[in-house]
């Protein structure tokens, strides 16, 4: 509020220097990954939920999806980040990470299904990437993960993402490869001068006498 339109490129440039990127508020894609404060700042936290959330967002921002896609990482089973109503949610526990899928908030709430439990952050990230890619490849356009999971079944998704290590790695690799071409930050582009004429101040009109 209070920022003049012609000042926006400079504001976006400053945000970019601080490490911020343009999020997707309405796109059919990843929304900002929600986290709690995790083990660094909460006595109940079992893992670094904030750090894992940052990693997931850096990997997956800009991706196209059949519908909006929400992720969350809660640092303990108290679930302050509401990971169990997200499309992909992580619940940190003392021995690792519980991975949940197919949740939904809003009018028709659906609690997630437990996909599996893993021991390390890297495993959690690989499973997340594989699940996202499977959803992108097989869900119908405008399908949220909740109806998609109900339609194809949890056992099918587990068979592809959890039980088949080679298939999981291939799905994750396809997702990461595609992200090389998708992570285009409009703030950064405009800070560099793209559409600069849109932000230029109009010249004052000069009236000439009629002939």
Where is each model-derived feature located?
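Small-residue-enriched alpha-helical segments and adjacent helix-cap loops
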Residues: 1-98, 192-211
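Catalytic cores of large soluble enzymes that bind and process phosphate-bearing ligands
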Residues: 3-7, 41-48, 116-123, 137, ...
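General structural feature for long, well-ordered alpha-helical segments within catalytic domains
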Residues: 7-11, 32, 48-56, 120-128, ...
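Generic secondary-structure signature for well-ordered alpha-helical cores
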Residues: 16, 20, 61, 65, ...
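Flexible, glycine/charged-enriched surface loops at secondary-structure junctions
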Residues: 25-27, 65-70, 137-151, 168-178
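A glycine-rich phosphate-binding loop feature that marks nucleotide/adenosyl-phosphate handling sites
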Residues: 32-33, 72-78, 145-157, 176-181
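Mobile "lid/hinge" segments at catalytic clefts and subdomain interfaces of large enzymes
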Residues: 70, 75, 79, 84-144, ...
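Acidic, Ser/Thr-rich low-complexity intrinsically disordered segments
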Residues: 162-197
């Amino acid at each position: 509020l209070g920022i003049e339109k012609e000042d926006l490129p400079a504001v976006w440039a400053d945000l970019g220097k601080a490490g911020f990127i343009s999020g997707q508020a309405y796109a059919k894609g990843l929304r900002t990954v929600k986290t709690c404060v995790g083990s660094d700042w909460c006595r109940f936290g079992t893992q670094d939920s904030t750090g894992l959330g940052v990693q997931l967002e850096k990997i997956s921002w800009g991706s196209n999806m059949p519908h909006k896609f929400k992720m969350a990482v809660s640092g303990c089973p108290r679930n302050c980040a509401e990971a169990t109503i997200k499309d992909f949610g992580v619940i940190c526990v003392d021995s690792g990470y519980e991975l949940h899928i197919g949740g939904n908030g809003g009018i028709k709430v659906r609690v997630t299904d437990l996909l599996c439990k893993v021991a390390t952050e890297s495993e959690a990230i690989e499973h997340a990437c594989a699940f996202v890619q499977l959803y992108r490849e097989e869900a119908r356009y405008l399908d949220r993960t909740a109806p998609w999971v109900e339609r194809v079944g949890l056992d099918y998704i587990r068979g592809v993402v959890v039980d088949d290590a080679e298939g999981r790695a291939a799905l994750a690799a396809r997702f990461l490869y595609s992200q090389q071409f998708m992570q285009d930050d409009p703030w950064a582009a405009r800070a560099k001068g793209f559409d600069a004429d849109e932000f230029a101040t109009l010249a004052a009109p000069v009236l000439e006498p009629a002939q």
